[in-house]
Amino acid sequence: MVELEKRRRPPPQLQHSPYVRDQSNSQGMTKTPETSPPKRPMGRARSNSRSSGSRSNVDIDQYTIPPGLDLLPTASSPPSVHQVSQQQQLSPILANKIRSPFENQSQDQNDNSIDPTPAGQVTIPVEAVSPPALDELSKFQNGSTETLFRTGSPRKKHTHIIILKSLNATFETKFLVVPFKPDGLKLGRPVTNSVNKNNSGSKRDLFSQQVRPDNGNFDSRVLSRNHACLSCDPTSGKIYIRDLKSSNGTFVNGVKIRQNDVELKVGDTVDLGTDIDSKFEHRKISAYVEEISVIPLMNTVSDPTNLVMKKQDHTNKNNGNSTNINGIKIDRGHHNQHIPIRSHLKENYTEAGVTSATTAQRAAFEAAMFGDINNSELDDDILGPETEVLSGIFINNSAGTSINLINMIKTLTTELSLEKQELEKLHSMQNFMQNYTINLDFINKHMIDMNEKHLLKLSTALQKTLSENNDALLKESEDQLKEIKQQNNKVKSACSLKEKQNHEKLQELESELRELNLQIEEERGKNLVLTQSNFNGGINNDNNAKVKQNDSREEKKDTEDTLISTEELGVVEGKRTRVSKGMLFGVVAISFGLVATAVKQLPQ
């Protein structure tokens, strides 16, 4: 059994794995012949490897650790050189330089040449891992095998969140986590793989299920499935948008963009597509960049409970004495003396569910206090040349640095820097409060003086304004009064002139009336004389006519039988003319009387 275990070689180093330390290429270690362990040169040399989580190619969460490893007892005796080598291979340490299979083979030969079995200790029986298994280990084990961590990618201790608010009520407010380049967040219409194509209601339900406030899907027919893409520059922290050859185009502040990156800032408007008609399903997506937040990623140290992946390939064989970790079989009975595990970690890790709420509260507090701090600028200042310190901790005994210690020191340095900044803020607040309380009387007096000066300025300005307004009103009223007086004088002069004209006209009318009265009196006298004369003449004429009539009657009686002579006819005609003349004179007298009565009735 011992000879069989001697012939078995240790597990090969995994490519792109943080669980491997390159002993052959690392600075500070020299490769010796196969019959002797590696020798360390005199003096301290600086290690080129970086701590995990900073420059690693693959995250720790990509590997599956069996939960039974926490229950293994610690080693009772110090490990040998070969055991330290295997412990370095199984311990999670970052290696920037990946060895080729030929180097792995030479290293395996060197390890086989060393006596691996001191008293009471044996090696770990491990099966070789094929190259396809190495590729599988380099991928995510959380259900998606599309995203890979790229070599040399910077630490991502913060994330950018962009808040898009709708301008035309086409979607709910979105809170999008923008990934770093070369990754991107797709914006577009969700893809539905509905079996029943005629059922439009089910398709609409699928659309509504896929459109959420935390993804880039929008429910609009004018959008393409791959319409636009959001990405963040890891060096500058700027957020960019680019069009993905959409049919209806992408517009930033009303300007159509192409396939190149365009920076987004707070206050910009983003239009996806164009309006086809007034219906809701054919409207464009008009969004407003309300805010861009920088949130630090809390709890970057992965708990062992998080190291166990969803797709864990763990089986127990040989009556519970062997463990299979993704194709690597480890003898559980012989592993207990090679990987020392602290017994107190189990108690802390079992309380992960209890401390999750505290972690969430702390994350919210840190995001509120330090959300405006760009962690990429603090990496070198906070952590510094961390591997120079951390790699030299176990360099004297040819042991690697534990990933837990590295993460613990990183977490402590980060927390110390944040606490220092918080303390500086508190100190500044304390200084402000002290200065405020000390200078409170002076500040109050100064404020009172300033208020009095301000009040005086306001009062003088108000008085000046009121006086100017009063003067303007007085001047305006005086002008109006003068104008009214002038108009009154004009009216008085016009009235006096009119009265004078009326008086003169009245005098003229009175004089004319006097003259008419005199003329009427004269006419009355004349009429009276004429009437008397006419009356006397009429009586005489009547008497003469009667006498003549009597005479004529007598003559007629005498000469009834005789012929009337021409002389008698002439006499008769003369009588007729006399009668007509008397009648004419009477008519004239009557007319004069009527005129006199009419003149008397006229107003004086």
From Swiss-Prot:
Q: Which PROSITE patterns match?
A: FHA_DOMAIN (PS50006)
Q: Which Pfam families match?
A: FHA
Q: Where is the composition biased (Basic and acidic residues)?
A: 548-560
Which parts of the sequence belong to the FHA domain?
185-257
Question: Does the record carry Chloroplast as a key word?
Answer: no
What top-level branch of life does the organism fall under?
A: Eukaryota
What membrane topology was assigned to this protein in its record? Answer: Single-pass type IV membrane protein
The answer, when asked if DNA-binding is one of the entry's keywords, is no
How it assembles, according to the record, is: Component of a complex at least composed of FAR3, FAR7, FAR8, FAR10, FAR11 and VPS64.
Purpose: Participates in the control of the reentry into the cell cycle following pheromone treatment. Involved in vacuolar protein sorting.
Protein name, per record: Vacuolar protein sorting-associated protein 64
Q: What organism does this protein naturally occur in?
A: Saccharomyces cerevisiae (strain ATCC 204508 / S288c)
